[in-house]
């Protein structure tokens, strides 16, 4: 698998984890966020290694957006 395909796989996984935050039980939300963040970081790394700087930039923006959503809507849920 080439790095760009790997980046796409990690991105899909990250988006699934992000979507799962909305359906998760309160005590599971942070785990979903942690998984989403991990998968986005791996996608960004794979994109960079493949020379996909535009893809890496897009993924970084998406990660920041998902983090902002977590901070505003989910932080403290289940604590």
Language-model segment annotations:
Residues 29-38, 53-64:
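Short, charged, amphipathic alpha-helical segments
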Residues 12, 16-18, 42, 57, ...:
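Extended rod-forming repeat segments used as scaffolds/tethers
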Residues 19, 38-45, 61:
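Extended, non-membrane alpha-helical segments enriched in charged/polar residues
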Residues 2-23, 64-65:
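Amphipathic alpha-helical repeat scaffolds of TPR domains
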Residues 3-13, 29-41:
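Short amphipathic alpha-helical heptad-repeat segments
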Residues 7, 61-79:
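Alpha-helical linker/edge segments of TPR/alpha-solenoid repeat scaffolds
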């Amino acid at each position: 698998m080439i790095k760009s395909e790997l980046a796409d796989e990690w991105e899909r996984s990250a988006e699934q984890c992000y979507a799962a935050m909305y359906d998760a039980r309160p005590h599971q939300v942070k785990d979903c966020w942690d998984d989403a963040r991990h998968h986005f970081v791996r996608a960004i790394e794979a994109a960079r290694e493949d020379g996909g700087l535009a893809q890496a930039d897009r993924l970084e923006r998406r990660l920041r957006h998902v983090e902002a959503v977590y901070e505003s809507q989910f932080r403290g849920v289940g604590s």
